[in-house]
């Protein structure tokens, strides 16, 4: 402040030295004796903190890349197993750590990815670490019973509602499909063998609307028809082949693949969460549209039914649907949770199979290391440099991983603690102290689940606190989840994503996820991090010469 003393606003990497120096000066100003360290004795510690963090980051995440201070971690898509050029391209564009998600693919695919990377390293002369991300306990929705198969065709219309291109469908034998990419409808009989150009196939669709499809082409395996109306057919829909006023033959639609269904949920709805072996189903209503049997869906983790309590919150599909547990039932019908839905995005949201479940208030008594994780860990120790622990919540989870690594004689393996739930945030000091028994550790701010668990409104605050605490512990941080996601998926970043990418430069590493435009995102992120290198490090502005100010004086 006015005395020229430190505001304590940027003391993380040298906390004790800063406090000692400020106290020493205050005692001198107050003409009081000071028994602690003198100011000159703290000088070395100011530089030591930053150098310790830099050393730990180099050991855990690799050397600092040319031109920037921050490493880039890239998640491997499945196609990388069969595309060595893709991995080489990532490496040339600035990838410093290759992330393999053990929740996808398998050891054969992972080994090919590793081989491709090692070959690319040899060809380019660029080193790259490998991180294996353990899947952890699977907490997801179970399957939903499929609905009846249905096929819909629809013509193309202009802005005036006029048909510009009629719908084209091909009636073909069951199990066959036309060589063209048009919509195929299987039939039980051989209507296509009797059809001729100019014929009409008459049917009544699922909505009771008559449709006349005009035959425009016929070959030995299909008859191709056009129609300028939308239509829906299911298995058993009757077909009548007409030639002028004459009926040539009759047929019916054959077996159709069952449709994947979803549950439509709105605020105020009831939802039953059951064990995963019971298929989910939508709510059932009576003739007055009153629900007499609520929607239900399975949960993949059985410990939920023993550890969850009434009044606790529950979220589905990255927070798109939220609710409160009203009751926990265990009887002859099995274990289940009765949930009252409290919010759904856009008023009504669809819940599908294999969507994430978050229970921020529930203390689940389940190990962060599953049996599959232990098998994957053995592979990771042979081929990788880092292993990321998912679903970590307690110091015991970290201790179990350390013990498993010692059993595998993999003391050199780096540990990444994924902070992705509320309990991990609350226990972060204890998690760090446990992990710091090892020399090579880092922390990942996994903002996907973390945002759901702690609330999106607290996300900015919590990620800052994680950065500060880890800097005080001299532990490197990986900034992860949805970094430049719009750019990676759609080829164009949002404005907020650009700011987020710039802010990520205060961590030691930034993680990019998968997407069709990931190479573009890799270039973009590297450019942003290179530009921000001269402007800021951690919380400190570097006071680089500003081009804007220079231009203003011209």
Can you say where each PLM-predicted feature lies in the sequence?
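Non-catalytic helical/linker scaffolds that mediate oligomerization, partner binding
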Residues: 1-554
